[in-house]
């Protein structure tokens, strides 16, 4: 069976199509009229127009090679020198505090000083050479932290935990006779104040929630301290320095864990007594079930012994 196909194109259309070599694009529509006498007037769908109007040029694809966006060398050098300068200022302050800044330097001290200068020089060269890379990384990190306030809270709190542990070490090796358990509460309050200063732009309900969680954590810590002190007084025992350190460390870890848990799950501390009661009830119920199963096992064994036929017992007695 032959297909009776009749082309709808007229001979004139076929002749024009063979001359131009282009078909009408159904999505773009008909070609608009243009004046060929004007300079640079080209059909908008022509290949040359696509090349000339391409949005991605070589300069836009290579922004690092463009001279407009690049910083001058002196500015790069100054910005790269800033973190090294801050680090050296901190080192000088520490040496001044120890009263060891260029005092009684021997061969080992001068060797260490020369090595430090070499490291700072290499770091400056590295930061200047890879200026675009590390500045872009810093910008991306800063923008990401600013856009995610929840991560800010986590990061600042973890940093403050590290700072508090450093303070514990300084107090441990120093001559400060302080109760380490009270330091935990001080660190918690100072951490909350630090968060408050850094998060002034937070909504009021977030700050209210933060302080509510803080006071609940302090309440838990106070209960633990009172119970511990009461037991020590009851048994007429005193906590030595090691005991204070253990108490302070445990309270600090528990306090930070509860605070972080409360910030992540609002109302968790209020629901904790119910969870504790349910846990104790489940534990006691499990013990009761275990005891009941043991009793059933003994009871079943006694029933099996009582169900032995009388003939078998008589036969065993005759033997």
Curated annotation (Swiss-Prot):
UniProt cross-references to InterPro entries, sorted A to Z: WTF (IPR004982)
Domain of life: Eukaryota
BP terms from Gene Ontology: meiotic drive
Membrane topology: Multi-pass membrane protein
GO cellular component terms, A-Z: cytoplasm; fungal-type vacuole; vacuolar membrane
Subcellular location field: Spore membrane; Vacuole membrane
Transmembrane stretches, start-end: 73-93, 110-130, 153-173, 187-207, 215-235, 241-261
Main location: membrane
Keyword set, alphabetical order: Membrane, Transmembrane, Transmembrane helix, Vacuole
Family label: Belongs to the WTF family.
Biological role stated in the UniProt entry: Acts as a suppressor component of the dual wtf meiotic drive system, and can suppress but not confer meiotic drive by compatible poisons. Wtf meiotic drive systems promote unequal transmission of alleles from the parental zygote to progeny spores by encoding a poison and an antidote from the same locus; the poison is trans-acting and forms toxic aggregates in all spores within an ascus, wherease the antidote is spore-specific and targets aggregates for degradation by the vacuole.
Name the record gives this protein: Meiotic drive suppressor wtf16
Species of origin: Schizosaccharomyces pombe (strain 972 / ATCC 24843) (Fission yeast)
